[in-house]
Amino acid sequence: MGVSPVRDSWLVDEASDELISSERKLIAVECHDDDSQVINVKVEDICKDLSDKVVLKLQFRLCYKYRKLLDITLLGCRMKVYTQLKNTSLNSLKSLLQKRMNNICNDNYAIGIRMFFVNINQFIKSCKWIVSTEDVYPICTLYHMRDSDVFNVIK
């Protein structure tokens, strides 16, 4: 076990079961002068492992505004995170995690599929109390119902 990076190399479009191309992953939209959250962090579950350390089930989601601009129905990642923490409250943890993710996203000029996963990896590395990750499940569903305006964005 250990902290392994979240990879997007074999990311599949859940709607078509096709591998998402590198070119598509590099498409991004500006997010640098916006005060809204770019990536939402949700704590799905908190429990303790056999050594009495806190284990978290986390969910990351690209917020609706940017999914819509990128013609993405869903972009997210779930994972189980093992920590060095002995105890924590759900509310303080949620607040801490979201603030940390917001700080990382505030340094971005643009957001897209690739940057979404870069930000999650940076987030995990910045939390020194995270010991390991497992059951990492990235998910992406592209929007296929209309012609896309997504090619007018930053590449």
UniProtKB/Swiss-Prot annotation:
Family of this protein: Belongs to the nanovirus U1 protein family.
Name listed for the protein in its UniProt record: Protein U1
